[in-house]
Amino acid sequence: MDPNTVSSFQVDCFLWHVRKRVADQELGDAPFLDRLRRDQKSLKGRGSTLGLNIETATRVGKQIVERILKEESDEALKMTMASAPASRYLTDMTIEEMSRDWFMLMPKQKVAGPLCIRMDQAIMDKSIILKANFSVIFGRLETLILLRAFTEEGAIVGEISPLPSLPGHTNEDVKNAIGVLIGGLEWNDNTVRVSKTLQRFA
């Protein structure tokens, strides 16, 4: 197991504990409390996947954070805040395209790491384009919100979405999932292309 994956989980556990203490003192607003609840479910899922105890991970995470804070000066903190890059949100799809319900005649679903891939195997001999909404940081895809495959007529025939229980996918996870989706659609003699925005960052 990648040690960075473990240490990231440990720090996330401790930071969740700190945020929980803030909520207990009634200092958190509604979005803060909502994120707290969602992140609790996420941490339980990650802990189960990694085989790590959350209480133990929280204690180790506290030690990591305390060590960093001991070395951190106020000036360094100011510089970090000033130089931290902001992520950009890029959209291929409209809100309607993202929220539209769709149905599969021959459904196929596959989980690839932290991503769920769904496609309709009944689709044949179509020209298909992949569109996605995602955030970008440092010139790379940071977080996939949703990817969908559309026919020229606008019908949705495939989708890649993050699993709520396994957040934290990487650029490589997204690339692999796109490869699986394209392979599945091309199997039925469909022609698949990727949007220019997605090509640039994924």
Swiss-Prot record:
Intervals of motif Nuclear export signal: 137-146
Gene3D superfamilies assigned to the protein according to its UniProt record, in alphabetical order: Influenza virus non-structural protein, effector domain, S15/NS1, RNA-binding
Post-translational modifications: Upon interferon induction, ISGylated via host HERC5; this results in the impairment of NS1 interaction with RNA targets due to its inability to form homodimers and to interact with host EIF2AK2/PKR.
Region (RNA-binding and homodimerization): 1-73
InterPro entries linked to this entry: NS1, NS1A, NS1A_effect_dom-like_sf, uS15_NS1_RNA-bd_sf
Ranges spanned by the short sequence motif Nuclear localization signal, renumbered to the chain: 34-38
Main function: Inhibits post-transcriptional processing of cellular pre-mRNA, by binding and inhibiting two cellular proteins that are required for the 3'-end processing of cellular pre-mRNAs: the 30 kDa cleavage and polyadenylation specificity factor/CPSF4 and the poly(A)-binding protein 2/PABPN1. In turn, unprocessed 3' end pre-mRNAs accumulate in the host nucleus and are no longer exported to the cytoplasm. Cellular protein synthesis is thereby shut off very early after virus infection.
Comment block on domains: The dsRNA-binding region is required for suppression of RNA silencing.
Family: Belongs to the influenza A viruses NS1 family.
Protein name: Non-structural protein 1
Species whose genome carries this gene: Influenza A virus (strain A/Fort Monmouth/1/1947 H1N1)
Gene: NS
